[in-house]
Amino acid sequence: MGRMNLLSKIHNAASNQVEGYCIVKSVAQKSNVKGSSYLDFILADAGGECVAKLWDYAPEQHGTYAANTVIKVRATINLWKEEEQLKIDRIRNVKADEAVDMAELIPCAPFAPEEMFEELYRCAEEFKDEDLRMLTQYILRENKAAILRFPAALKLHHAMRGGLLYHTTTMLKAAKAVCAVYKQLYPTLSTELVYAGIILHDVAKTQELVVGELGLASAYSEKGQLLGHINMGMAMVERAAAELMTDEHTTMLLQHMLLAHHGVPEFGSPRPPMFPEAEIVSQIDVLDSKLFEMYDALSGVPVGGFSERQWALDNRQLYKHGHV
């Protein structure tokens, strides 16, 4: 059937029939002017979203379909007030063992989550500092299931399935390049501290965000609202250190890097970076998040054009220059 997602087929359909997989963004029972009941869906995939209606449904179907789940539908394309929408002819929930490429349905990181996770774990495996190695690998193992699918944010940078790993592995690659330069100038720079700080800096996002099986965040958790991932990350390190009986000073340095990675109090860090490794972690975090947001904002802009103002980037308009 080629591409599995449904909505990309609407505009390229050879007939007025389409079939494929999509996400239920919302579903509600409604009635038309004649009193006939129907289920009103908003369906979505990586290509966008579309209104769809299920008429003449059986009473037992009400409650069968839920938001943030994957379904397969066969539908007829109709025009309503010059907008394309779907009349659902057949519909079913996806089976647990059904192979569905989630990258065609929702925004996903461009690399396999298992491979990105292994990149982080192998990096920690090479640490000569046993305490840093144990702390980092322990926290990765304890949170692996969530780390594999969590986004890095509710909105904005890396707010996609696997986005937390994408953000973290990109930062780690950047850190290795930066440390290769500055280690020559400042031999006492601890690359292992930098790498451990980067690997764990956002790990408590797995507790801060409410994320379903699709790997997209829908809200902040109660703890996320009240404590935030910086404080929760420090607590995760504290618990791991107590379990592993790691060196108190090394544990404190790692905690400081998590505490300071947002740089300044107005962005959530109660202390600024107070040693070079913490500064590197903070600066690379800012760089990666801002570059992601800039390229995302420019993705639909023609060469020579300007983006809309980006409030997350100090309300700047961005320019697409065309040079490569």
Where are these regions (language model features)?
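Short, acidic/hydrophobic/Gly-rich beta-strand patch recurrent on exposed beta strands
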Residues: D40-D45, V211
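N-terminal intrinsically disordered, cationic/polar leader segments
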Residues: S282, S289, S299-G300, G304-V324
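Acidic/His-rich, divalent-metal-binding segments that scaffold phosphate/diphosphate chemistry
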Residues: A99-G224
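OB-fold single-stranded nucleic acid-binding module
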Residues: S26-S37, C50-A103
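OB-fold nucleic-acid-binding modules
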Residues: M1-E19
